[in-house]
A protein has these predicted regions:
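Conserved AMP-binding/adenylate-forming core of the ANL superfamily
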Residues: 29-79, 83, 100-103, 107, ...
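Conserved pre-ATP/AMP-binding loop-to-beta segment of ANL
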Residues: 24-27, 150-168, 174-175, 180, ...
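Structural core segment of the AMP-binding/adenylate-forming
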Residues: 87-151, 156, 261-262, 267
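Conserved C-terminal "lid"/linker of ANL adenylate-forming enzymes
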Residues: 464, 468-469, 479-480, 501-548
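Conserved AMP-binding/adenylation subdomain of ANL enzymes
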Residues: 187-204, 214-256, 271-275
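Gly/Ser/Thr-rich phosphate-binding loop
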Residues: 255-259, 271-348, 361, 370
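C-terminal boundary motif of the adenylate-forming
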Residues: 417-419, 454-485, 513-514
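Conserved ATP-binding/catalytic segment of the ANL
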Residues: 360-361, 368-376, 380-443
Length: 548
């Protein structure tokens, strides 16, 4: 069902109400246990009723117009709380607590966004540290103990330009920032995704992506609400413990729409043997999207090859490009379109630029000259779209320079900070602007250096790596941190480091000043699994990494 004609001037609650009127008993969300059986199912009616009951309590607490942060484990509690906050006329801010040490950063975020309430289940509330409990003017609400009456809920008056929710960036290159997502932003982005994926109500979604992550929240909670697609959820913990559970859920429930970052596809290839793959029927999977991090041509090709025996079709692969500042989705391309550069490295197209459509409008701009680049010329990716947020929540200082950049006589562009180029109307992303390493008049991408290292050492004792530049008394120095995967002895990895040094010297042609092998899980990552390059640099300079 297409709703693109209604995405302008609407709000998310109006969409929810129309979905309720049209298909109240339709199953919308099903939650799976570890054995992949359905343990809980929500129709549109049940979802609305439980969210309205909680919203009535939140209204009684005086939260209208306030920010309410959410910290939940996987499950239905988050979805109900998220919708309830919006229905109460407040603004939800999903947060993540993966480890006990995350509470400090959560406390900083609560202060930053001025949260008036923290919504949590009792299991989380019981572990709250004093740093959270002593925050001034913060109500901690145990939502599983609140008894509300849906009949007491009063619908708030919402405008399409109002803040719908606050989506925090991943924090891979800087501290997480809260992006101010309006109702118009989210409905327009849902329309873009529905169009790109050609969604129909008969489609079935399957996801393990965390709800605090924009791909999980928007792609598998709000897009299903928009399009009527029934979605099955398994937990990220279950996927991490047994990657096959993701594909088993797709096969069992005939999932047609599912996806994840590149690392998840790589993990499936590593952990699922050919014999096990032969037992799966993935012929139903028509949209296998991949985004959130750089898409590897090698990973995509290996996944398609491994699961061909499962009936998986290579054309189902859909590399995507997006970011929180543009709500989520910017572009996508069905199938693998690969461009081999002169140096032999391969880039994957993450979008076909349809010249017949003016939203989103994507331009490649020279960071030095501020002019649009020619075909194949690398520059910063600029985006203009109704999906682009108005700015960062309560952080106006940089909004104009980031969210309203000028190109000749045209304004309103988002400067993504990503580098890329266009070739034959295909968009290719090559790295981050701030991750460019310059030597002898040449520019190198940290992502390319890491990719070259992983091509040699992945599966050979190295789980992941991060490269960054340092300024030293002797000049700039490239550092490469290599994280053990715990399956192979460190001595065997050390023996291959000279080969890696030589390989990087010849391709791409840069000298690594320092290589350090660090213990398993030592490298800092974001809540969505992205490596934190700046934090890695800080830890290295502070001597916090023990070497093996």
């Amino acid at each position: 069902m297409s709703r693109s004609h209604r995405s302008s001037g609407w709000d998310l609650l109006s969409l929810f109400e129309e979905r309720l009127e049209e298909s109240a008993e339709m199953p919308l969300f099903s939650y799976l246990g570890r054995n992949m059986d359905v343990r809980e199912q929500y129709s549109v009616q049940r979802l609305h009723s439980e969210a309205a009951a909680l919203a009535a309590v939140l209204q009684a607490q005086g939260l209208k117009g306030s920010v309410a942060a959410l910290v939940y484990p996987p499950g239905s509690g988050f979805v109900i709380a998220f919708l309830a906050v919006i229905m109460a006329g407040a603004r939800p801010a999903p947060l993540c607590r993966a480890r006990s040490r995350d509470w400090h950063s959560i406390a900083l975020t609560l202060r930053q966004c001025g949260a008036a309430a923290l919504l949590v289940p009792s299991a989380v509330a019981d572990s709250l540290p004093a740093e959270i409990l002593t925050l001034r003017a913060l109500q901690v609400l145990r939502t599983d103990t609140l008894q509300g009456d849906a009949a007491q809920w009063r619908r708030p008056v919402l405008a399409s330009t109002d803040t719908c929710f606050i989506q925090f960036t991943s924090g891979s290159t800087r501290s997480p920032r809260g992006v101010d997502i309006s109702h118009d932003n989210i409905l327009h982005n849902c329309a873009l995704i529905a169009r790109a994926f050609a969604l129909e109500e008969k489609d079935v979604g399957v996801s393990w992506l965390p709800f605090h992550h924009d791909m999980g929240l928007i792609g598998h909670v709000l897009v299903p609400l928009y399009s009527g697609v029934h979605n099955y959820f398994l937990s990220a913990r279950d996927f991490a413990a047994r990657p096959a559970s993701w594909l088993e859920a797709i096969a069992r429930y005939r999932g047609s729409i599912s996806g994840a970052p590149d690392f998840a596809y790589a993990l499936c290839v590593e952990r699922i043997a050919q014999e096990q793959a032969a037992l799966l029927d993935l012929s139903c999977w028509r949209v296998a999207y991949c985004g959130s991090e750089r898409v590897s041509a090698s990973t995509m090709a290996r996944f398609a090859q491994r699961f061909a025996v499962s009936g998986f079709m290579p054309d189902s692969l859909m590399p995507c490009y997006g970011m929180a500042e543009a709500t989520l989705f910017i572009s996508a391309r069905r199938g693998l379109q690969i461009h081999e550069r002169d140096d032999g490295r391969c880039d994957v197209s993450v979008g076909y630029l349809d010249v017949q459509r003016d939203d989103p409008c994507i331009r490649i701009v020279s960071p030095q000259e501020g002019a649009e680049c020619a075909q194949r010329e690398e520059g910063e990716i600029w985006v203009k779209s109704r999906s682009v947020a108005r700015g960062y929540f309560q952080d106006d200082a940089i909004d104009a320079s980031v969210f309203n950049a000028w190109l000749e006589h045209d304004s309103g562009y988002l400067r993504t900070g990503d580098l890329g180029y266009v070739l034959d109307d295909n968009l290719y992303v090559t790295g981050r602007l701030k991750n460019v390493i310059k030597r002898r008049g040449r520019s190198f991408h940290a992502e390319d250096i890491e990719g070259e290292a992983m091509t040699l050492l992945h599966g050979q004792g190295v789980a992941r790596c991060v490269a960054f530049d340092l300024e030293t008394q002797g000049g700039p120095a490239l550092v490469l941190l290599l994280e053990l995967d715990g399956q192979i002895e460190a001595e065997r990895v050390h023996a291959r480091l000279p080969e890696l040094q030589t390989r990087l010297w010849y391709t791409p042609g840069i000298l690594v000043s320092r290589m350090l092998l660090v213990p398993e899980r030592a490298l800092p990552v974001t809540t969505s699994g992205k490596l934190q390059r700046d934090r890695s640099r800080e830890c290295f300079l502070a001597g916090e990494f023990s070497h093996v």
